[in-house]
């Protein structure tokens, strides 16, 4: 194997050198396969280029017609009297420059430069200061690093041309195997911090999205049926249980998603489709996550029995509580935003006050699990959907509660043998919807005695035991629901006829939600872990 370092023997200039040989074109080739002019060579600290070497042709004055190699002038040696023992020693300092690559070297990534057009606050308010000489003069280490990086990139390109794959360390290969989707773009997102650790601060832009701004001061128009996919958001490594737009209209470009991969994420689902932040505050699956009414905090609960109120920008926990059951549903009180209801794998629903961090009231029934909660009458009443579906379960499938006294208002609402995994309130009519495992949406009155409509039934989708969600459009004209086969179905509220069917996902579509401001934007999530924004 030829040596990668070219030694110049001062005793004999005519003997063959295995690491460097002269060709007829006047160039010297080293063992690495790179060529340079004959007037260039390594020195102890510098590199010299001769004028003759730069203009060398086929008939060189340093070569005789007998093809015998004549002694070359040692123009590249800084110490002409050095002996071989001195040349074998380590050089006193690194060379300042090396052979230039085929293209100009890129600027060093370690050198921080301000973006174009960026003016610091001090420069905008005070007189311009004369920059220091140390700032203007590049350091010797930085120039050495840039030249070395450029030479390394040239060597990598040469090896690529020779079909030699560069070596990848084992640590990087293991990281690539663990993160196959880390290919960049909006589909692959960087992993979040470990569980219990606050993520990096999230800077929420104070300006309103240019797509939302024209609709803020106007009345909501008629909802139109979406036609195509605007963004396909990938980043979760588990099923996405629910999604929700930010309730503050000027910040409604943000979308919240809760997943079984122990995280919940905030996306910019209107402008760019990128993940803004990942929150890993739970040690088990996150079953429910809700925006606070102010749009600055997120309430989350999961299978680790934990409840967290996380600040959106700092990532810290404003409130933390420990439930005695696995949490499946959370709802803020519509009037008192410091109080929320929590239900899950328990026969009791609990009301928490975040100011004291304690449970203030309990609502107990003969059930095993609460599937969903829906507030009525501006928070004075609420409905709970349970998992009771036996023959004598007419008093336990959907229960109406008085929020203040914890008394049951009605327990004879739904009389069929199907559970209802989700509930949705109509924005303008005094009615609510119940998603049933009978593969249809049932319509009920939202005032006592909560009668079910026998004339209108929205069917055509499949539930099959999934927690398939449903929702009404902001104008109330359309209903949307997911399906266990991945479809997204929209119905006319008045006629109960199907308005549109979208082939949304390859696995079960769990969550569907209309944008509160944009009339034709719809978000859907699936058991496969992906989210789609339709327009």
From Swiss-Prot:
Q: What is the lineage of its organism?
A: Eukaryota, Metazoa, Chordata, Craniata, Vertebrata
Domain of life of the organism in this record?
A: Eukaryota
Annotated protein name in UniProt: WD repeat-containing protein 25
Residue ranges with Polar residues bias: 141-155
Q: Which residues belong to the signal peptide in this entry? A: none
Keyword field contains Repeat: yes
Q: Where are the WD repeats?
A: 235-277, 281-320, 321-362, 365-411, 415-454, 460-501, 504-535
Q: Annotated region Disordered: where?
A: 1-108, 141-160
InterPro entries, per database record: WD40/YVTN_repeat-like_dom_sf, WD40_repeat_dom_sf, WD40_rpt, WD_repeat_protein
Q: Which SUPFAM superfamilies match?
A: WD40 repeat-like (SSF50978)
Instruction: Write one Pfam family the protein is assigned to.
Output: WD40
Q: Which CDD domains match?
A: WD40
Q: Which UniProt keywords apply?
A: Repeat, WD repeat
Is Protein biosynthesis found in the keyword set? no
């Amino acid at each position: 194997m030829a040596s990668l370092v070219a030694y110049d023997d001062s005793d004999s200039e005519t003997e063959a050198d295995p690491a460097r040989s002269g060709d007829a074109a006047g160039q010297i080739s080293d063992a690495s396969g790179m060529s340079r002019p004959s007037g260039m060579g390594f020195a102890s600290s510098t590199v010299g280029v001769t004028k003759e070497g730069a203009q060398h042709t086929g008939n060189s004055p340093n070569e005789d017609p007998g093809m015998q190699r004549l002694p070359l002038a040692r123009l590249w040696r800084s110490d002409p009297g050095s002996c071989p023992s001195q040349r074998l020693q380590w050089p006193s300092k690194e060379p300042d420059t090396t052979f230039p690559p085929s293209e100009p070297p890129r600027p060093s990534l370690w050198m921080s430069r301000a973006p174009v057009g960026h003016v610091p606050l001090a420069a905008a308010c005070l007189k311009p200061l004369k920059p220091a000489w140390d700032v203007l003069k590049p350091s010797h280490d930085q120039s050495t690093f840039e030249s070395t990086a450029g030479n390394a990139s040239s060597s990598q390109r040469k090896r690529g041309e020779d079909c030699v794959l560069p070596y990848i360390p084992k640590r990087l290969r293991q990281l690539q195997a663990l993160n196959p989707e880390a290919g960049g773009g909006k589909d692959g997102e960087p992993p979040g911090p470990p569980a219990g650790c606050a993520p990096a601060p999230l800077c929420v832009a104070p300006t309103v999205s240019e797509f939302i701004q024209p609709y803020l001061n106007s009345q909501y128009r008629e909802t139109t049926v979406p036609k195509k996919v605007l963004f396909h958001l990938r980043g979760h490594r588990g099923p996405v249980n629910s999604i929700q737009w930010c309730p503050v209209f000027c910040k409604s470009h943000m979308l919240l998603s809760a997943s079984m991969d122990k995280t919940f994420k905030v996306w910019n689902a209107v402008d760019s489709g990128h993940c803004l932040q990942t929150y890993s505050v739970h040690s088990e699956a996150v079953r429910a996550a809700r925006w606070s009414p102010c749009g600055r905090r997120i309430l989350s609960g999961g299978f680790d029995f934990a409840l967290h109120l996380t600040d959106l920008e700092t990532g810290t926990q404003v409130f933390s509580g420990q439930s005695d059951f696995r949490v499946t549903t959370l709802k803020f009180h519509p009037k008192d935003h410091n109080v929320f209801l929590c239900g899950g794998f328990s026969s009791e629903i609990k009301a928490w006050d975040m100011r004291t961090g304690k449970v203030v009231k309990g609502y107990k029934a003969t059930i095993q699990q609460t599937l969903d909660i829906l507030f009525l009458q501006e928070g004075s009443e609420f409905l709970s959907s349970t998992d009771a579906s036996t023959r004598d379960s007419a008093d336990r499938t959907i229960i109406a509660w008085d929020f203040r006294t914890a008394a049951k208002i009605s327990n004879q609402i739904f009389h069929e043998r199907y559970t209802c995994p989700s509930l949705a309130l109509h924005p303008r009519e005094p009615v609510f919807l119940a998603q049933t495992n009978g593969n249809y949406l049932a319509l009920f009155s939202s005032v006592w005695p909560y009668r079910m409509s026998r004339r209108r039934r929205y069917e055509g989708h499949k539930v099959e035991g999934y927690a398939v969600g449903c929702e009404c459009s902001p104008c109330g004209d359309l209903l949307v629901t997911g399906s266990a086969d991945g479809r997204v179905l929209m119905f006319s509220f008045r006629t109960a006829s199907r308005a549109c069917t979208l082939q949304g996902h390859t696995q079960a579509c769990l969550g569907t939600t209309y944008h509160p401001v944009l009339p034709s934007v719809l978000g859907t999530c699936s058991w496969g872990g992906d989210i789609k924004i339709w327009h």
